[in-house]
Amino acid sequence: MNVKTALKLIVVTVVAGFMTSCNNSRNYDKTSRGTGWDITGKDGGPSYRTDYKEQETGPGLVFIEGGTFTMGKVADDPMLDWNNTPVQMTVNSFYMDETEVTNNMYLEYLDYLKYTFPPSDEKYAAVYEGAVPDTLVWRDPLGDHQTLLETYLRHPAYRDYPVVGVTWIQANEYSKWRTNRVNEKRMEDQGYLVEGARFNHDHGSQFDTEAYLAAPSQTYGGNDSLLKGKKSNKLTEVINNDTVHKYVQQKDGVLLPPYRLPTEAEWEYAAMGMSSTREYNNYRGRKKYPWDGSYTVSGKRKNRGDQLANFKQGYGDYSGVAGWSSDGAMVTNEIKSYPPNDYGLYDMAGNVAEWVADVYRDRVDMKLNDFNYFRGNQYTQNSLNEDGSVELIDYESIEFDTLRTGRVVATGMPGEIKKEEIDDDQIFMRMNFDRSDNRGYGDGDKASSRFYMQEEELNEQQRMYNSPRNSVYAVADSLGNLEMEKDVDDGNRTTLISDNTRVVKGGSWKDNAYWLDPAQRRFYPEDMATNWIGFRNAMDRVGSGSKKGHRPRD
């Protein structure tokens, strides 16, 4: 074999190998890996988004890459609460607000409700009034806080201070509203809604993300003109010779997941910010606070001695000596006044404590679940009309709830899907759940009590947590006028823990340094508010658990 023949054989072998490798690594960006069909919609078949990269970060949020960590207190327990024993836990990647929700952010919500549901109209008065924070939380029988009561929420001097006086229920309603306003603007910006659609303040036709996905043609009360933006006008298909308008679907990747309260596990994981202690696939050491070190003061030269959070430093000492204030605040302080933690989150220790989503129990049971732990699931399903379509709440059927405190709040707004508990069809032959309300699952329900095997009547009487049963009800007088009566349970009680008690995390301006440890936990009734509890939102991460691009490996 001469040299030329050998070279020809080499070239043929290389080309054949190249063609074989190309054949084995087909590009399925525009064709189905299962059928080979076109998936761009050009051939008249189904279309799927093929250029989607990753979830965009919503307004105000920062990305938190999930992982495993030790949840609970890893130091001594001088209070002997024994409610945060350490467990190994994993949380999925998620997003969290960079700061606490501020007065200005919450006022934007109140103004929207005020314009959309004018409180001057008796029918809607409770909508706005039920969302307003309780400013009376600033009162103290032996303190002079009248100025804070009158100015803290609305004065521009406090615009970037964390909102307080908000119940857990109000925080959840704000989260739903924020979800809808963010997605509404995204669709408008991308041409799926008419420009300015978000300023539609017709009280009977509000945009709701979940309702849009289930019944898009009924959004805005069926006002089709608002649903046809520059881009959505092109979303049509021909069915039986009729041109049908197409709407944004989940598969298009346009809509963001809901804003919500973070779970306790997410909040603690994010507050710890363990990335600074990571070495390869392990953590070297522990963290007592969201920052490195065992002290609450900065050791850096430029601000040495300054406190790294806003908290009560001792009896009668909320900020230090005048002219040398170590934390710069008597009560709450402006957001971003202190350095962020490793994830870029501000005020995860101090300023205000924060509501999280979980129902409180005195333990986190790793044996029941060690991934994305959350106590408080209440499964619901969409309520359907007789024709099988989803039932939407309209301005005549706004849902209100009278809390134990006597306050009336709106829990179902026009444009939202009416919800109901899951029925037996969804529970039948299920191995992973068997009820709608799981707040007391494994700790507080009948199945976890020693009376479980006794008579049903006895089961109904027994409660693992002997918490008060207060109620509010209406009584008609001789003229038929309804008056509110409050039934206060004054019996002997052993605990305030119930299915309506929520976890509160983090320290506040009113707490000492003990509560700055992210592992500390306490509880507060979900329908009550105080001047030291605020909140921030979180959002699920869909798709990859890490950001695209280079991942550090050291």
Language model: regions and residue ranges:
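Bacterial N-terminal signal peptides that target proteins for export
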Residues: M1-I10
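A short glycine-rich, aromatic-capped structural motif
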Residues: K53-L148, R159-V182, G350, G534-F535, ...
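Catalytic loop of the DD-peptidase/beta-lactamase superfamily, centered on the K-T-G motif
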Residues: W515, Q520-F523, M528, I533, ...
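N-terminal low-complexity, Pro/Thr/Ser-rich intrinsically disordered segments
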Residues: D38-E54
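C-terminal motif of bacterial Sec signal peptides marking the signal peptidase cleavage site
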Residues: F18-S21
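Functional-site microenvironments in short loops/helix caps that host divalent-cation chemistry
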Residues: R26-K42, F63-I64, T70, A75, ...
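Short, P/G- and charge-enriched loop/turn segments at secondary-structure junctions
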Residues: R49-D51, D81-N84, G491, R521-E526
